Amino acid sequence: MPLTSDVKEELSRVEVSKTTVRAAELATILRFSGGLHLISNRIAVESELDTPLLARRVRKDLAELYGVRSDISVIPASGMRRATHYLVRVMEGGETLARQTGLLDARRRPIRGLPNRLTTGSREEIAAVWRGAFLAAGTLTDPGRSAALEVTCPGNEAAMALVGAAGRLDVSAKAREVRGVHRVVIRDGDAIGQMLRAMGAQGTVVNWEEMRQRREVRATANRLVNFDDANLRRSAQAAVAACARVERAMEILGPDIPEHLKYAGDLRLRFRDSSLDELGHHADPPMTKDAVAGRIRRLLAMADKKAVDEGLPGTDANLPADLDDV
């Protein structure tokens, strides 16, 4: 995944001066890339990483922040492992390090989510948590229908903590479990760009946005080329008409719109080219296309009734005169 590699290389070079921010990133990397192991009755802290650059960053932070010596070994690609990995291990002082980073609680028990001090830290520390999680277990796919920024988590509690951290950065993320693997996913294009910036991938986000815009232009061009298809033309006309009527309904009803009807109307206006079925998938929680259609019908009917009662132009007043030429 070239994009993932680009992001990780850029993030591995982010310079951080604040000790608390460096510590937040390091603790999250350790939590998401390995964790604690018992070796010869001693607690060892291990971290399996993608690149030698990241391994050097982790070893440098371990030495400078906690004064511990770490070993590194190379795990060659084989079988299910498609690429070479780098294992950083701390044996001497492993338990002390685990306590200092919050991987062990006060009762010497491994934490299940993220250390509390990380999830309640400053905005800069929260961004470092996400940077560490992505460096340890993140992927970024190309812009398009299936675009996603995704982090594989060590468990459900860690996933939920990461979702909460994203919320602190004003980014909407969702946790999901597939075949026992917990992941946190960001799918909205704007949210992906916002998270990349927050983590510090300023260069990569520019490239990602350019790719996204090119894909949108191509998709729009393809739709225009296919407009000769009568079904597509009718769908386009119906979408234009629906949006025009919903906009007029919002004007007529003003603040009197019931929240559930307003939500359906906002969905229609936000995703103007989407079918009713697609609108249902965009809803949170998801709705059936019949539920979406029903709410929009009730919204229009309520607006038209108020328009008649008050002698106002109805929802048809906003329909374009050249609708047949769409």
UniProtKB/Swiss-Prot annotation:
BP term (GO), one: regulation of sporulation
GO molecular function list: DNA binding
One Pfam family from the record: HTH_WhiA
Name this protein carries in UniProt: Probable cell division protein WhiA
Keyword DNA-binding set for record: yes
Lineage, top ranks: Bacteria, Bacillati, Actinomycetota, Actinomycetes, Micrococcales
Alphabetized UniProt keyword annotations: Cell cycle, Cell division, DNA-binding
Organism expressing this protein natively: Clavibacter sepedonicus (Clavibacter michiganensis subsp. sepedonicus)
InterPro entries named among the record's database cross-references: Homing_endonucl (IPR027434), Sporu_reg_WhiA_N_dom (IPR018478), Sporulation_regulator_WhiA (IPR003802), Sporulation_regulator_WhiA_C (IPR023054), WhiA_LAGLIDADG_dom (IPR039518)
DNA-binding region in chain numbering: 275-308
Family the UniProt entry places it in: Belongs to the WhiA family.
Function comment: Involved in cell division and chromosome segregation.
Entries under NCBIfam families matching the protein: DNA_bind_WhiA (TIGR00647)
